Amino acid sequence: MTFSVDKVRADFPVLSREVNGLPLAYLDSAASAQKPSQVIDAEAEFYRHGYAAVHRGIHTLSAQATEKMENVRKRASLFINARSAEELVFVRGTTEGINLVANSWGNSNVRAGDNIIISQMEHHANIVPWQMLCARVGAELRVIPLNPDGTLQLETLPTLFDEKTRLLAITHVSNVLGTENPLAEMITLAHQHGAKVLVDGAQAVMHHPVDVQALDCDFYVFSGHKLYGPTGIGILYVKEALLQEMPPWEGGGSMIATVSLSEGTTWTKAPWRFEAGTPNTGGIIGLGAALEYVSALGLNSIAEYEQNLMHYALSQLESVPDLTLYGPQNRLGVIAFNLGKHHAYDVGSFLDNYGIAVRTGHHCAMPLMAYYNVPAMCRASLAMYNTHEEVDRLVTGLQRIHRLLG
């Protein structure tokens, strides 16, 4: 099917609005993507005519809601090519998924003297949970350093592994630099040393197909809201053998088999023992609609369109004086930059006056900011609904800011 950005844009109501009297150019999808009508309508329809508490209900609404929820689990498993839908846990998002692994698998498998490997480009969500785990148990956190071009110093990776390495936790795509890491070779190396691998896929799944079986990762996690779905819902994939061994990290309803005041509690089987309490069923329904929407467009078609747009953007930005770009030439989704000596907040504020939405700040990646010795960066992110015209507006806006501020 031929990809039509105009048809895609027509599905996103917010893209028709104005900001400061100008058409909105939304270049902040890496923070959170906008939602198509199909997602909004699916969630609204569920709340209007199909809502009920899931699991254990014998009435029609409950049974139908449960079936819809579990069908989304199946759809998500197909989306990332998991072996089974029962390898997927519904979580609030990438952050909760990583914390679940750290508190369940991590508490059971990482001991004093062990080590965990991360990289210098990680989002705080893939740093802080491991720092907390290491502090709890007396383990060491090791870091793959960056190159100036935004790639990792992969030649150092073999020196970081040893017999005490329990986990490599690595981002699929950097949320600041757009760097796509060579997961296949990194995962192979980790497994050769007996370590497990967690992949933060928050910035990858919307840009091209992901196949967790081909990657052979042990854990893969992503959020719905960056994938054109609702907030407050995400997916944690865990290889089935690992998942069945992991203890729950939250207690409550839905995750138990039996509860006795005298004999204690037993857990239900995975993945449901990791889904304590009433789930975000409306969000799950919306996520299912988002997966259906993206799959119908075709991730390969989306990838081709977005890569052409990225190449155009990088070439056009060369015309902006005093613009510093961060990251490699080959990248996915994001362009981080600074303009001269001006603070990112000032540049972002001027762009907002022109109707252009970009993200400013440290992007939850303070160690990366420290590496580049800057307090903040601007970040423009390109999604499937962005256009060449919007790129031109960004370039013109930056040129105008340079003329105004010098």
UniProtKB/Swiss-Prot annotation:
GO terms for cellular component: cytoplasm. Pfam families: Aminotran_5 (PF00266). Signal peptide: none annotated. GO terms for molecular function: cysteine desulfurase activity; pyridoxal phosphate binding; selenocysteine lyase activity. The modification N6-(pyridoxal phosphate)lysine is found at K226. Pathway: Cofactor biosynthesis; iron-sulfur cluster biosynthesis. The active site is at C364 (cysteine persulfide intermediate). One of its GO terms (biological process) is cysteine metabolic process. Keywords: Cytoplasm, Lyase, Pyridoxal phosphate, Transferase. Its EC number is 2.8.1.7, 4.4.1.16. InterPro entries: Aminotrans_V_dom, Aminotrans_V_PyrdxlP_BS, Cys_dSase_SufS, PyrdxlP-dep_Trfase, PyrdxlP-dep_Trfase_major, PyrdxlP-dep_Trfase_small. Its cofactor is pyridoxal 5'-phosphate. It catalyses: (sulfur carrier)-H + L-cysteine = (sulfur carrier)-SH + L-alanine; L-selenocysteine + AH2 = hydrogenselenide + L-alanine + A + H(+). It is found in: Cytoplasm. Homodimer. Interacts with SufE and the SufBCD complex composed of SufB, SufC and SufD. The interaction with SufE is required to mediate the direct transfer of the sulfur atom from the S-sulfanylcysteine. Cysteine desulfurases mobilize the sulfur from L-cysteine to yield L-alanine, an essential step in sulfur metabolism for biosynthesis of a variety of sulfur-containing biomolecules. Component of the suf operon, which is activated and required under specific conditions such as oxidative stress and iron limitation. Acts as a potent selenocysteine lyase in vitro, that mobilizes selenium from L-selenocysteine. Selenocysteine lyase activity is however unsure in vivo. Belongs to the class-V pyridoxal-phosphate-dependent aminotransferase family. Csd subfamily. This is Cysteine desulfurase. The gene is sufS.
